Amino acid sequence: MKVILKVDVKGQGKAGEVKNVADAYAKNVLFKKNLAVEATPGNLKAFAAKERRAEEAAEEELNEAKRLKEKLEKETIAVTTKAGEGGRVFGSVTSKQIADALKSMGYKIDKRKIELEHPIKALGFTKVPVKLHHDVVATLNVHVQEA
C-alpha cells in the first residue's frame, strides 16, 4: 500500500515522502498513530498544495528578513551606560540592552538573535551581527554613550 508519511518514521523515511509499505503495517501502525495517510490522488494533491504554501511562507519570511536587514543597517542604535575615566564602561553592554534599545526604536528582535562574541566594555561605535534568518545576517551600528 502506498502511503504519504506525515512525520519522519524510523526505518521508513522522512515526512512528505510517498512510500510503499505492507498493508497491515500501514493500517495497524502508521494510520493508528497518525504517522501517515493513504496516498490517494486527493491526498497527494492536498499534500502538494500544503508544501507549496509552506514554501511561499518561507520565501515571504526570507524577503521580510532582507527588508528588515536593509532598515537596520541604516540605523545607529544608541545605548547609554555609566562610564569611568578613559571610556571604560562600568559593567558591560549586553545583547539584552541592545534588544531593549531596538525595541524602543520600534523593532522587535529577540536578544538571542544578537550575536555578541563578548559584551561591549568600551564607549564608542561597535558593529554587532544580528541573525534575522538562517540566510540573512544584518550588521548593527551600536553607539555606546556615557550617561
UniProtKB/Swiss-Prot annotation:
SUPFAM superfamilies: L9 N-domain-like, Ribosomal protein L9 C-domain
Protein name, UniProt field: Large ribosomal subunit protein bL9
GO CC terms of this entry: ribonucleoprotein complex; ribosome
Tree of life domain: Bacteria
UniProt xrefs under InterPro entries: Ribosomal_bL9 (IPR000244), Ribosomal_bL9/RNase_H1_N (IPR009027), Ribosomal_bL9_bac/chp (IPR020594), Ribosomal_bL9_C (IPR020069), Ribosomal_bL9_C_sf (IPR036791), Ribosomal_bL9_N (IPR020070), Ribosomal_bL9_N_sf (IPR036935)
NCBIfam families noted in UniProt: L9
Keyword DNA damage assigned: no
Translocase keyword on record: no
Pfam families according to UniProt: Ribosomal_L9_C (PF03948), Ribosomal_L9_N (PF01281)
Function: Binds to the 23S rRNA.
GO MF annotation: an example: structural constituent of ribosome
GO biological process terms held by the UniProt record: translation
Similarity annotation: Belongs to the bacterial ribosomal protein bL9 family.
